[in-house]
Curated annotation (Swiss-Prot):
Subunit description: Homooctamer.
KW Lipid metabolism (keyword) present: no
Record flagged with keyword Chloroplast: yes
Cellular location(s): Plastid, Chloroplast
EC top class named in words: transferase
GO process terms (BP): thiamine biosynthetic process
Protein name: Thiamine thiazole synthase, chloroplastic
Organism: Populus euphratica (Euphrates poplar)
Length: 48
């Protein structure tokens, strides 16, 4: 049995830490398309 590793989604339930994780999560998801802010939450499936 392997424990489930903590993911960004599980850490986002902490609203205090969530904003920093979302801000740091900005990235290029396909060539020429950069996501930032709450779009990162959408891409990662975050519960926000």
């Amino acid at each position: 049995f392997q424990p489930i590793k903590e993911s960004i989604v599980s850490r986002l339930f902490n609203a205090v830490a969530a904003e920093d994780l979302i801000v740091k999560g900005g990235r290029e998801i396909v060539p020429g398309m950069i996501v930032t802010g709450m779009e990162v939450a959408e891409i990662d499936g975050a519960p926000r």
